[in-house]
């Protein structure tokens, strides 16, 4: 039996189809920075920037790119849902750097 809390979490996952995010890695004279902008809808936007040396997100970004490519080629709903969950976990790893 599925608990109400689990059901609610599943529903929230379903509604996250239209989240857009932009991740920028840059360099300034005093160090590296990572900027993220997330648009949940037209009215709700989150932006955050952190400054740090040696920001290591290359693996996560490569994994997101691979997941996106695989998602486009898969036509089976169950496989697409599994890829979506993996992509959300990878995005969560990236967001953990920002302390959201």
Swiss-Prot record:
It comes from Sulfolobus spindle-shape virus 1. This protein may be involved in virus assembly. InterPro entries: DUF5517. This is Uncharacterized protein A-100. Pfam families: DUF5517.
